[in-house]
Amino acid sequence: MGMILTDEQQAILDGAKGETMAKVMKTLVMFGEAFHAEKMVPVTSRYNHLVTSFGLGVLQPVYDLMQQLIDAGAVSGQKFSADPRPLDPNVPANLLQQLVFKKFMYNKQDFYEGQLEKLGLLNKDAFTCTCYMSEVGNKPEQGEVLSWSESSAVVYANSVLGARCNRNSGIMDIMGSIVGYVPYFGLLTDEGRKATWIVKIETSKKPEAQLLGSAIGMKVMEDVPYVVGLDKWLGTELDDAACTYLKDFGAATASNGAVGLYHIANLTPEAKAQGEALIAEGARVYVIDDAELQRVKDSYPVVWKNRDAKPKLCFMGCPHMSLEQLKTWTDRVEQALAEAGRSKVCIPTVFTAAPAVLKEFDKTPYAARLKKTGVITSYICPLMYMNNPLCGKMPVITSSNKLRTYTTARYYTDDEILVQITKGGARA
């Protein structure tokens, strides 16, 4: 049985708003039918967020498609933010790496940003994977239906904000904005938001967000976990510290697995409201203790050519760092450098955050203090940087499990990273 469309939706499909709009609607209908959706529902958030922010030369079909939309006047019904820019002159790169970036990889960046502006880009600073930060301003309300695609933003919006969004693909995201509807299935439905895993946290200390997220993602894959025992370490209020933790935790669940929604007992909105009623019948159980986290960490392959190479670069901020993280890390780096008797970090280190967050950070005394330590701040996407084959060959370290998963970067915990960048690359 096919999808049941309203008269308005059927009219768009039949060409009432032109051939291009009909194609967009047909694409969404086919997408929905592939997942057995019975109907389309309105997109209700104020803004959208697009995953495709990078002007790779090989993405010509994307530019052709976007141009067709622009020419037909099929612009987004919502303004939107987009994932981070791939390039920043502040980030260290040698002449050859720069040549590859500008001439061979992201040689359509300016052209593509021009297309995004015509389609409905919020503003020139709206490039970040953490669009939900209050400084950026694209923060959906609980229950709103979204057409987002960036996996770390989708899982945050679903879990921490209680919005409703599937893990859409790039381009499919803007199509939902253009017609104003998305297929109703999966994480948009009450049933699809029920947990099929109970994850019990039995660690002796607060688990590393990126490591815990990785463990859960690899175990449950695309299922919904209900996490018990984490409120012992995070509390029961979604304050800045808890939201920052869940940002990094969620990104790891979404990239090391394919999690689009998690519930944290006594903390996230739906878990607070419904409790264990969110757990589906027959849910499986996964217990995480210190030994399990260590097992997961030890399982990561080291893909450097030379395992013992001295790191040449450190990236922090995948997803982009919060204002709270930038401040906390300024204190931590300063203190560790003082203990080591140094004034500057001994590995080139880049902290990445949203342009709007960096603007706020620059207004605080912390910005000058961080600059003194030699740490560089940037709005770049570290993943886009690492996709340059010449950069991928370098020994790069990170505390991001997402960056580890998608690139050659090597994962260390926050504490281990701090030792490496302040004490000369020594292991923690």
Question: How would you describe each model-predicted region?
Answer:
Residues 1-315, 319-428:
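Non-transmembrane, aqueous-exposed alpha-helical and coiled segments at domain scale
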